[in-house]
């Protein structure tokens, strides 16, 4: 009992308000100094949760590039069914960003193993439970590769528009990779020209699905973080591993929009399509991540399917509910 009270004292109120708490996870320092990750949690109602179909399940969510966790509706979806919901703000993102750091920078996606391991240690303090991994965009790539390196650690993997292939496609990636690797050796922190014109953020604002979180404006800039050769080399290495084929070792659900709009100039179609990733390329790449993969294409969904307009968002939740309750966790 005393140990439980000490652990609870490490959690403090989160910016998302009532029902959400956060805990700082100390990690090994890197060349830029001290490094932390941040775990956010929402627990099920103590009375209703004990009878939910997902009691005994922990969910770990990992966000995308230039992002942080703020999707309260998604958290409630899981806790309403009895699961404990956790979200990880990775090192140098969101709640975990510290002054003097390069936002979102990493030189190897494998380095995130430390962030995930720290989160899982905290989640398992109350004893082992079934684990569902939930990743969006870059977080989907990170969790796919993590699951492949940690067979049988997860009971299920849910991917929301995972960044499994470069927007230029396989041949474009293969042509670009040696140039990026060379640049990464010479100047890993050099800044690339800006390519994010803010259209994806504009689409969410027009849909009214992007909430205002006080004090979090810098965590998700309108045009995204600056990108760097060292970081892009890490992403391309991850894409190459997916292209070669991996085995995540658990049932996997991939949710994607039915269409994409290249973000070259603003179009109203961006409010009903993915304007970040070529979803057809992602669907093809999804067939190479495991032996039991379900791919769901959602008409009118945007890049984060859970931030789409009401109808496709409801469809995404229905698909997820049916999949998770239909035997994925057996």
PLM feature spans:
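Active-site glycine-rich loops that stabilize anionic/oxyanionic intermediates
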Residues: 56, 63-68
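Catalytic nucleophile-loop/oxyanion-hole region of alpha/beta-hydrolase
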Residues: 66, 94-130, 312-316
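Conserved alpha/beta-hydrolase
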Residues: 67-70, 75, 79-99
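Alpha/beta-hydrolase-fold enzymes
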Residues: 136-138, 142-227
């Amino acid at each position: 009992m005393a140990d439980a009270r000490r652990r609870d004292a490490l959690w403090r109120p989160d910016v998302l308000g009532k029902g959400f708490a956060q805990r700082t996870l100390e990690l090994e320092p890197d060349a830029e100094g001290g490094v932390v990750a941040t775990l956010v949690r929402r627990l099920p109602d103590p009375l209703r949760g004990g009878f939910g179909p997902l009691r005994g399940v922990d969910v770990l969510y990992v966000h995308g590039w230039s992002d942080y966790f703020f999707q309260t509706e998604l958290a409630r979806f899981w806790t309403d069914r009895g699961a404990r919901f956790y979200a990880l703000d990775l090192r140098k993102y969101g709640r975990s960003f510290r002054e003097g750091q390069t936002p979102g920078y990493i030189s190897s996606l494998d380095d995130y193993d430390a962030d995930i391991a720290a989160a899982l240690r905290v989640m398992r303090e109350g004893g082992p439970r079934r684990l569902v991994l939930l990743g969006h965009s870059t977080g989907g790539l990170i969790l796919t590769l993590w699951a492949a390196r940690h067979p049988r650690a997860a009971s299920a993997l849910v991917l929301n528009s995972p960044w499994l292939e470069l927007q230029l496609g396989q041949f474009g990636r293969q042509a670009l990779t040696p140039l990026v690797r060379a640049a990464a050796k010479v100047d890993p922190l050099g800044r690339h020209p800006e390519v994010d014109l803010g259209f994806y953020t504009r689409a969410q604002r027009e849909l009214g699905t992007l909430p205002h979180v006080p004090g979090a404006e810098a965590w998700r800039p309108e045009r995204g973080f600056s990108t760097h050769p060292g970081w892009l080399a890490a992403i391309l290495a991850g894409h190459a591993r997916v292209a070669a084929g991996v085995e995540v070792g658990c049932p996997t659900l991939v949710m994607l929009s039915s269409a994409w709009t290249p973000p070259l100039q603003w179009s109203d179609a961006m409010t009903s399509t993915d304007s970040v990733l070529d979803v057809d390329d992602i669907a093809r790449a999804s067939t190479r991540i495991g032996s039991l993969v379900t791919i769901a294409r959602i008409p009118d969904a945007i890049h984060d399917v859970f931030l789409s307009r009401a109808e496709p968002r409801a469809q995404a939740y229905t698909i997820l509910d049916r999949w998770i309750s239909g035997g994925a966790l057996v």
